[in-house]
Amino acid sequence: MVSLLCCGPKLAACGIVISVWGVIMLILLGVFFNVHSAVLIEDVPFTEEDIFEDPNPPAKMYRLYEQVSYNCFIAAAIYIVLGGFSFCQVRLNKRKEYMVR
């Protein structure tokens, strides 16, 4: 029988902890980028043309903020998937403990 178990119990538990932390952090970052937090301006990928040559500079900056916000939410979704994988590995490890050899 093929086993889907590929991580040990400690690695799977570590994966869950890191996934939970990553999801919380990235969702908060996504929310703060979505409300156009001025503190995060250094993380917005803009050029001088975006500021000086655009007739409506705030709109362009807001679009860039929202783009980074969406990227944070996508990364949080990936962390959720990896957390689910780690949770499945924990369950498989628990099941393996109770199996008769």
UniProtKB/Swiss-Prot annotation:
Function: Endoribonuclease which preferentially cleaves ApU and ApG phosphodiester bonds.
First-level EC class: hydrolase
Keyword set, alphabetical order: Endonuclease, Hydrolase, Membrane, Nuclease, Transmembrane, Transmembrane helix
Record's keyword annotation contains Disulfide bond: no
Main localization of the protein described in the UniProt heading: membrane
Family annotation (Pfam families): V-ATPase_su_f
EC number of this enzyme: 3.1.-.-
Family per record: Belongs to the RNase K family.
Intracellular or extracellular location(s): Membrane
PANTHER family: RIBONUCLEASE KAPPA
Regions that span the bilayer: 13-33, 68-88
Name of this chain's protein: Ribonuclease kappa-A
One example GO MF annotation: RNA endonuclease activity
GO cellular component: membrane
Bilayer topology term: Multi-pass membrane protein
